[in-house]
Amino acid sequence: MKKLVYMVVDTETATLPFANEIANNDPELKKKIAIARPLVYDIGWTLMYRDGTVFEKKQFLITETFSVPSVFNTAYYASKRPLYLAMMERSEIECLPWAKVMEVFVADLAKCDFVGAFNSMFDFKKAIPFTELYIQKLYSPTYYEWEEMQYRICENIVSAPYQKKEKDFDPDHFSFRDTDYDLFDVWGLACDRLLNKKGYKEMCFEGSMLTNSGDYFKTSAETAYRYLREQYDFEEAHTALADAEIESFILSKILAKGKIDLGIDYFPFQKLGHPMDYVRTMKPSKKRERYADVIYQKMYDYCGLSEDEPPIPTKYMERTMEKMEILKDWMGI
């Protein structure tokens, strides 16, 4: 019987070269552009069997993005450039045109039964398709007209209030160059099968691993790997192949629990519930006080209450302040 083959992909991305200008160097506004218009500069993937055996791995830098300072300098991890140059010096990675890299990528896709990433929505529905479009336009005579249109779109991204737009979307497949590939999402599967447990949640409390708002438990590849490996100081490399390798390990733990479901799971972190609800069910104890304090500190910082100037009140802040009063009661303050 043929062994099933799984491809796990990770990308590191920059964005369009005028992002900083449009965002006026505001990191949050730039982040909105970077999420909506990602350009891959580092791509890595593994091929593995369901027992976790990785039998092939690849990693490439992309010439049209990594080697163009105005693009690469928009990357969140632009400071890693010397690391990549050292890797190239040691022949650990090649920098090739997108077309060449995609030839290798498509050839490996043909070997696979399933393809996925930790955040398949980002990698397969945004980063790879938008980079494919960008490269097509870059080598076309209409690039400047397209760039001008993208500039206007990015202006709208940072200025217009968020509106959910309904559009055709296939969560079960990665469509690329006229072929559909069965798609899984490691993040959603991990939240469903590995992380929605008391041990994981208590690790998050003990390590203050909640989202910045304090409303949810962190469910990143990094925190999942810490839990599964019991390596609580582990930090992701944030280079494509290294991250794909830890995501492959997480997938192996998921596969050990049975057949995977296809598709992208929207907001999978919500499956773990709210940290406040977890603390609410605890009996009064020092541990309960400690966990309540972890949530309180997250909310305090997120609302900007530690800043010299008090923030402008919002409805969200008012609701958060109400939660903080409840937390203070649980903390015995």
Where in this protein do the model-derived segments appear?
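Conserved protein kinase catalytic core
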Residues: 16-18, 191, 249
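Conserved non-catalytic scaffold segment of RNase H-like nuclease domains
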Residues: 2-128, 132
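Conserved DEDDh/DEDDy metal-dependent 3′-5′ exonuclease domain
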Residues: 78-198
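Active-site catalytic microenvironments for nucleophilic, acid-base chemistry
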Residues: 130-137, 192, 227-228, 250-257
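A structural motif
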Residues: 175-180, 195-207, 211-228
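Acidic two-metal-ion nuclease catalytic site recognized across multiple nuclease folds
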Residues: 205-216, 227, 241-333
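Aromatic-glycine-rich donor-binding/catalytic loop that engages nucleotide-sugar donors
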Residues: 228-234
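Histidine-centered active-site/metal-ligand motif
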Residues: 237-238
